[in-house]
Each structure stands twice: as structure tokens, then as C-alpha cells.
């Protein structure tokens, strides 16, 4: 006699396609369990032998609220299951370079929350060093650093094994050289050698003949204005050098650019700390500031100053009046910073950027900003708590895909190239909890 068939799934919500209807032989149904999961934010039901596999549940999940900005993303993460198994809080800290984007994606109405299950600590922007230290001592769930944590970069804490951590590009930006000479000094040009000489104390005045020559000579409008600073003995003619007093990945990118430019006496700041007078930099009229926000404020408040700051900070209302120097590209052309010129640098570098090959300096091409940088998010490769593991890597996957188009450009960053987003996902898929991958694909 033919085995009778038994309907085991309801037809409710069939019009919207929210529940999959399955028809199985009644004899087989006794050995299977009904399990559910969200796929593309819709319920999907399935039958499995004995128990629900990872990513499925006997409890029917509720569709998540729409992720703010997800439809605007340049990259897609729709094939990644963003469900988090339980409520979880994540501790975060690190690079001030990242602060604007971290802020908008972890707090407020635009934040990633996985349907309200994920909350983030406040982001104090303590600097890249604090991000690396916090992730290795266990006080953070996600650390952020402009410079990846590697022995080659001199940023690997003592006793730490690099292979125990996964590092992914979080955002793409560029550092700029800002200055404050008051009005009448727009479009100042500085060579890498001149910037190095300023920080080494060789050039101490804005009226220096080398700077005047770079800016059209003594007969040019800008050259005359610079020369007049010295002739009139104006206080702002004395260059006030500003540097990052705490561990800073922006400092690392800045010093690496100068090092790559071939300036004698310049080397990448291995610990990403630029020391003051008598230390790594020989300038004597020098002051330290806390972070990128402090650097922008310091330049804005100090006549005669020079400093280096992440590009997005000069776009913040209140900082927009900061003058930014033009720099030379690899072809010797004078370039102004923009999302386009920073993006061109990343495009020229291609997909070769990894934690062991992270610098983007003096790439070939037209309108290429001479030093751009990826900032990195760091998580342990093995995380004991399953919910923490899933929340950490799913947030980072969401941010490196959806978050790029929705938020990165608006905050003054260049959206990650698609190839870099794919690289980030591949790395995140190696993070596990109890040997099980935490970034699971929908099916």
C-alpha cells in the first residue's frame, strides 16, 4: 500500500513567501525536526534529522527591522546571515582616524544592531595603540588600528602571536598636512623633503627660502607673502610643529610616507609614537596633541602651526577653514587632497594590501594622493563566546559592505574597493567559536 503523505508545514503567509512549505512522507517525518532561520530577512523552515544545525532554531525568528542605509551600500552582504543568537554587548576602542565612521555605525539610529541584539560601548578614540593593546589583553572585543598589528611594522605587543588574530581593512582614508598662517596663504605647496625638514628642525620659519622657492619664488604673490612674514618679523613666521603625543597610526602613515620619499633621518615610527623635542624629531618648537580631533583643533587655534590630520576631520563643521598643503605625487605634479585622489591611490595599489604590506605611498598615476591608508579592525581568531563571536564578525562584515556606501563617503572616507571588501569577508570567515565558523552564509 502506498505510504500516505502528511502536510507538515502551514500555508500561512504563503502569499508573502515568508515560510517554506515542505511535504514529506509521514514515516520520515517522525525522525526529523522542523527548524527555522531568516534568509534575506524572511522566515525559512526546513526539516532536519535529529536536531537543528548551526544557524537554525526550533523557534521561529522574527524578521529584523531594516538595516539603516543597507540599500545604499556599494557592496552586498545579502548572502551573509546577520542573525545573532542572543543579546550581546561589544567593547570597542582604538584609532581616532576611525572615530567618525565607528561612531555613526555603532551608536544612534543608524547603528548596526542585528535587530536590537547588539550594543556597543562608547568609543573613546584612544588611539591605535589602545586598540592593539585592548584586543590583546582581552579588554576589547574589537580593536581598531591604522597600522596592522605585525612584527614587521613594529606594532606587535610583546609575547603576542600575530596568527591568533584576524585583521581586516575597516575603512580607507588619507592623512593631510594642515597649516595655519591666517588669510592670504591659500594653496601652499610643500615637498616631502620640506615637511621632513620642518619636523627635524632644519626649517624653522615659513619664510625659509626653500619654501618660498617651492611656492613660485620671491616674485610670486605667495612667495612675497611668505617672505614678508620674515621681513616684518611676525610671530606666526616661527613654525609651531604639532605631533601626536600618543600611539597613533596616523603618525605611522605620515612617517612612512616621509621615509618612502627618501628623506635621510626619517624612519617609520615603529611604535607609532612620534616623540617630541630631542626624540625622534629634532624640532624644538613642538607640541603634542591627543588625537586627530586634537590635531585639527590645535592647527585651527595656533597661528604659524603645521600638523598632520586624517582627511575626514577637515570636513567636520568648524574645521573646514583649516588650510591644507598641496603635495607632490610620484610624477611631481601638485595634488590637492580629495576623496577622488585618495581613492586613486587605493586603486593604484590594487589588492596587494595585507597586514604585512599595508602602506599606500607614492603610487603611480594621475591625481594620486601620495599617502593613503586603510585602517584595520582586529578580532581574536578564536572567540569562546558564540554570541560575541557572531556579533563581532557580523558587524564588521556589515560595515565593510553595507556601511561603505551608506556611511563612509558621508563621513569623509573613500568606500572600500569591492576587492578589499571581499578580502575582508574571506578573513572574517576564518574566525571561529569552539571550532565553528561565526560568519555563516545564508542558504
Describe each region flagged by the PLM.
Residues 40-67:
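Extracellular/mature segments of secreted proteins
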Residues 34, 51, 91:
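Conserved beta-strand positions that form and line the central face of beta-propeller blades
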Residues 1-27:
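Secretory targeting and sorting signals
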Residues 29-41:
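Secreted, propeptide-processed cysteine-rich mini-domains
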Residues 63-443:
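Flexible loop/hinge segments at secondary-structure junctions
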Residues 22-24, 29, 45-46, 432:
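Processing junctions and N-termini across compartments
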Amino acid at each position: 500500500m502506498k505510504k500516505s503523505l502528511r502536510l507538515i508545514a502551514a500555508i500561512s503567509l504563503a502569499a508573502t513567501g515568508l515560510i517554506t512549505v515542505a511535504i514529506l512522507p509521514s514515516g520520515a517525518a517522525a525522525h526529523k525536526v522542523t527548524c527555522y532561520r531568516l534568509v534575506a530577512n524572511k522566515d525559512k523552515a526546513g526539516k532536519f534529522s535529529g536536531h537543528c544545525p548551526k544557524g537554525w532554531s526550533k523557534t521561529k525568528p522574527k524578521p529584523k527591522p531594516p538595516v539603516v542605509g543597507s540599500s545604499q551600500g556599494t557592496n552586498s552582504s545579502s548572502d551573509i546571515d546577520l542573525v545573532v543568537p542572543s543579546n550581546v554587548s561589544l567593547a570597542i576602542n582604538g584609532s581616532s582616524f576611525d572615530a567618525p565612521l565607528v561612531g555613526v555605525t555603532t551608536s544612534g539610529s543608524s547603528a548596526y544592531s542585528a535587530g536590537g541584539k547588539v550594543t556597543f560601548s562608547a568609543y573613546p578614540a584612544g588611539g591605535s595603540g589602545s586598540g592593539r593593546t585592548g584586543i590583546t589583553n582581552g579588554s576589547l572585543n574589537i580593536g581598531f588600528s591604522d597600522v596592522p598589528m605585525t612584527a614587521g611594522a613594529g606594532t606587535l605587543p610583546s609575547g603576542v602571536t600575530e596568527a591568533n588574530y584576524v585583521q581586516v581593512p575597516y575603512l580607507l582614508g588619507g592623512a593631510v598636512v594642515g597649516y595655519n598662517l591666517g588669510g592670504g596663504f591659500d594653496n601652499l605647496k610643500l615637498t616631502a623633503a620640506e615637511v621632513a625638514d620642518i619636523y627635524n628642525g632644519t626649517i624653522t620659519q615659513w619664510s625659509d627660502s626653500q619654501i618660498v622657492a617651492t611656492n613660485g619664488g620671491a616674485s610670486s604673490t605667495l612667495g612675497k607673502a611668505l617672505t614678508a612674514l620674515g621681513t616684518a618679523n611676525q610671530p606666526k613666521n616661527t613654525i609651531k610643529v604639532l605631533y601626536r603625543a600618543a600611539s597613533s597610526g596616523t603618525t605611522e602613515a605620515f612617517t612612512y610616507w616621509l621615509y618612502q620619499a627618501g628623506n635621510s633621518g626619517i624612519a617609520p615610527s615603529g611604535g607609532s609614537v612620534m616623540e617630541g623635542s630631542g626624540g625622534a624629531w629634532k624640532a624644538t618648537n613642538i607640541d603634542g596633541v591627543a588625537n586627530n580631533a586634537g590635531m585639527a583643533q590645535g592647527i585651527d587655534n595656533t597661528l604659524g602651526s603645521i600638523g598632520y590630520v586624517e582627511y575626514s576631520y577637515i570636513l567636520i563643521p568648524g574645521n573646514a577653514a583649516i588650510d591644507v598643503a598641496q603635495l607632490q605625487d610620484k610624477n611631481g605634479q601638485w595634488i590637492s587632497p580629495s576623496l577622488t585622489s585618495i581613492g586613486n591611490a587605493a586603486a593604484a595599489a590594487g589588492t596587494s594590501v595585507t597586514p604585512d604590506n599595508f602602506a599606500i605611498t607614492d603610487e603611480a598615476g594621475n591625481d594620486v594622493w601620495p599617502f593613503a591608508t586603510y585602517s584595520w579592525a582586529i578580532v581574536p581568531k578564536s572567540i569562546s563566546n558564540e554570541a560575541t563571536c557572531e556579533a563581532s564578525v557580523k558587524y564588521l562584515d556589515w560595515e565593510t559592505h553595507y556601511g561603505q556606501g551608506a556611511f563612509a563617503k558621508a563621513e569623509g572616507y573613500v568606500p572600500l574597493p569591492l576587492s578589499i571588501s571581499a578580502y575582508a569577508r574571506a578573513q572574517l570567515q576564518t574566525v571561529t567559536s569552539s571550532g565553528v565558523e561565526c560568519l555563516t552564509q545564508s542558504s
